[in-house]
From Swiss-Prot:
Belongs to the peroxidase family. Peroxidase/catalase subfamily. This is Catalase-peroxidase. The record marks R88 as: Transition state stabilizer. The gene is katG. The keyword Ribonucleoprotein does not apply. There is a cross-link at W91-Y218 (Tryptophyl-tyrosyl-methioninium (Trp-Tyr) (with M-244)).
Length: 728
């Protein structure tokens, strides 16, 4: 008998057929339980912000400057300088960000993990991170990988003569991959038009995706699906970069600025390249893409398959990209690897070789580079940058800072001595609090006035929820701070019930004005604080209605943003298309409503128990959009009871879909057939899904009322303060 057959661990945990294999459509709650303390080696007492603030950032930068020109034989530096490689590393770390759900980006150092560490577009960035390991090892916990990747990109630019806009630390590492939807394709770089294509109709890209192919960060540099058409490529570029929060000017600046440096690599056929890191053998120690082409490195390196050096100054900031773009006519050719690229017609060989100082090459460009000349809007910007180098430098500096900091959230999270003083609109700025805050006695007085104003528990709770639940843990945007719910576009969102919202805000503003006018010594309450405080008052009243005396925690300190401080277009991506906590769907979607609920809960950083108790509480408090009765399983509305769970789990009720809408259900008395309740998929999933039913049973038990109230108050307080980074 073989040793393998004798192994007592043949059925080791995790090796068998999984639930997902048996039931691929089962609702997956695992995304709610990522990044727990169990996967974090730092320990519960470690505070990364405090560690970073003690870091000698200047010393780190000196070490990075030295690294740039210390070429290693195992992966030699192009032109004797690693700047181009490290710019690409930082760019690709940040460039996964997409505006639709705020996921991706540099904020967690996810480039270290699958799938990103093995995406074709990230080929050989494993070497860049290995080059950085001695510096990461030296400074240890004081600088995260997430911060180091971006800082290295900045230093790369600075070491080649470019003045950056600034750098902010504060990106704490995570220790496992994010579960992010990157597309449905089953093949790397699969072209559009297949059964799993991300495109439909007239090349309409699926939301929330931004990249054009599975395994790419942005667009295909050879053109759409490899078609070398610069004008068609411009359409892809505009769509993709817009989905990554960049306008046309920022897009041109980033492409031209980034392609001022370094080169691409396509010395030979891609068939020579080995497996990516996650598929490589254990002896490779996490490195991938081992090439059998000649030496496999340096002048023989194969990465994208393209062989392009854009400028005569690949290790120095210049304006040569635009000089070449407009100074030559271009003809289509192929790289040694067979990839479509462009070469300057009749040009002299003026481009330096990366490793042989005696060799020169003709200027070359990518299809997507030529888009900056042949798309009319891009050309106009490009010519202006060509004629005004200082505008180009400023635009690139600002766009690079935005690219590398877009997912960090508000400036309150920025750390370090290089944080720029200028406040930028895309940071969703909120004024600093410049007055004394209310105390506990003031809060009690204000709550009493709110409850005496005629506003209902439902109105108070739903308004506070609408303000706070815009928060996204992905890119740290949204939340109640700033009171942007009173501004465009939030005040007009369908989910926020504009007519009711306007009436509630008018009442709260009158209470606020009267209170502030009666104060001495400058004490004030902001509308942002009052919206949250009013919601807390509503929860307390609802608990009282259910026979429980509770005090909901409240921390003042929010401020009110102005319309001028609010980018309406940028803010629009926060509009909920689905909010299961309010039983709201803006339209009909292919994705089931319960999946959208879990997605929303994950963006709110909720666990499955938190999601469960929160939804059950909001139902009985009447927080549904449009005062819908779906899921309001109680006769004691606006009382904080566990009735949602009690009645959902009642075996005396039989559920069937309605004839009019298969996603809406009627609950009828099993004996009489009398209609008792109506509910949606989001409601019924707490009785049908085995894990969620187990949680519902906890809160539906006879002894659960007190625990239900306590747990609801805790998670309510959590959501109200998700954007209060000043309290951390």
């Amino acid at each position: 008998m073989s040793n393998e057959a004798k192994c007592p661990f043949h059925q080791a945990a995790g090796n068998g057929t999984s639930n997902r294999d048996w039931w691929p459509n089962q609702l997956d709650l695992s995304i709610l339980h990522r990044h727990s303390s169990l996967s974090d080696p730092m320990g519960k007492d470690f505070n990364y912000a405090q560690a970073f603030e003690k870091l000698d950032l200047a010393a780190v930068k000196r070490d990075l400057h030295a690294l740039m020109t210390t070429s290693q034989d195992w992966w030699p530096a192009d032109f004797g300088h690693y700047g181009g490689l490290f710019i690409r590393m930082a760019w690709h770390s940040a460039g996964t960000y997409r505006t639709a759900d705020g996921r991706g980006g540099a904020g967690e150092g996810q480039q270290r993990f699958a799938p990103l560490n093995s995406w074709p577009d990230n080929a050989n960035l494993d070497k860049a991170r290995r080059l950085l390991w001695p510096i990461k090892q030296k400074y240890g916990r004081a600088i995260s990988w997430a911060d180091l990747l971006i800082l290295t990109g900045n230093v790369a630019l600075e070491s080649m003569g470019f003045k950056t806009f600034g750098f902010a630390g504060g990106r704490a590492d995570t220790w496992e991959p994010e579960d992010v939807y990157w597309g449905s394709e089953k093949i790397w770089l699969e072209l559009s038009g297949g059964p799993n294509s991300r495109y439909s109709g007239d090349r309409q890209l699926e939301n929330p995706l931004a990249a054009v192919q599975m395994g790419l960060i942005y667009v295909n540099p050879e053109g759409p699906d490899g078609n070398p058409d610069p004008v068609a490529a411009a359409r892809d570029i505009r769509d993709t970069f817009a989905r990554m929060a960049m306008n046309d000017e920022e897009t041109v600046a980033l492409i031209a600025g980034g392609h001022t440096f370094g080169k691409t690599h396509g010395a030979g056929p891609a068939s020579n390249v080995g497996a990516e890191p996650e598929a490589a053998g254990i002896e490779a120690q996490g490195l991938g893409w081992k090439s059998a082409y000649r030496t496999g490195k340096g002048a023989d390196a194969i990465t994208s398959g393209l062989e392009v050096t854009w400028t005569t100054t690949p290790t120095q900031w210049s304006h040569n990209f635009f000089e070449n773009l407009f100074g030559y006519e271009w003809e289509l050719t192929k790289s040694p690897a067979g990839a479509h690229q462009w070469v300057a017609k009749g040009a002299d060989a003026v481009i330096p070789d990366a490793f042989d100082p005696s060799k020169k090459h003709r200027p070359t460009m990518l299809t997507t580079d030529l888009s900056l000349r042949f798309d009319p809007a891009y050309e106009k910007i490009s010519r202006r940058f060509h004629e005004n180098p200082e505008q180009f430098a400023d635009a690139f500096a600002r766009a690079w800072f935005k690219l590398t900091h877009r997912d960090m959230g508000p400036r309150a999270r920025y750390l370090g001595p290089e944080v720029p003083a200028e406040v930028l609109l895309w940071q969703d700025p909120i004024p600093a609090v410049d007055h004394p805050l209310i105390d506990a006695a003031d809060a009690a007085e204000l709550k009493a006035k709110v409850l005496a104003s005629g506003l209902t528990v439902s109105q108070l709770v739903s308004t506070a929820w609408a303000a706070a639940s815009t928060f996204r843990g992905s890119d740290k945007r949204g939340g109640a701070n700033g009171a942007r719910i009173r501004l465009a576009p939030q005040k007009d969102w369908e989910a926020n019930q504009p007519e009711q919202l306007a009436a509630v805000l008018e009442t709260l503003e009158a209470i606020r004005t009267a209170f502030n006018g009666a104060q001495r010594g400058g004490k004030q309450v902001s509308l942002a604080d009052l919206i949250v405080l009013a919601g807390c008052a509503g929860v307390e009243q609802a608990a009282k209605n259910a026979g429980h005396a509770v005090t909901v925690p409240f921390a003042p300190g929010r401020a009110d943003a102005s319309q001028e401080q609010t980018d309406v277009e940028s803010m629009a991506v926060l509009e909920p298309v689905a909010d299961g906590f309010r039983n709201y769907l803006k339209g009909k979607y292919r994705v089931p409503a319960e999946v959208l609920l879990v997605d929303k809960a994950q963006l709110l950083t909720l666990s499955a128990p938190e999601m469960t108790v929160l939804l059950g509480g909001l139902r009985v408090l009447g927080a549904n959009v449009g005062q819908s009765r779906h899921g309001v399983f109680t006769a004691r509305e606006q009382a904080l009871t566990n009735d949602f769970f009690v009645n959902l789990l009642d075996m005396g009720t039989e559920w069937k879909p309605t004839a009019a809408d298969a996603d809406v259900f009627e609950g009828r008395d099993r004996a009489t057939g009398a209609l008792k309740w109506t509910g949606t998929r989001v409601d019924l999933v707490f009785g049908s899904h085995s894990q969620l039913r187990a949680l519902a049973e906890v809160y539906g038990s006879a002894d659960a009322q007190e625990k239900f109230v306590r747990d609801f108050v805790a998670v309510w307080n959590k959501v109200m303060n998700l954007d209060r980074f000043d309290l951390a």
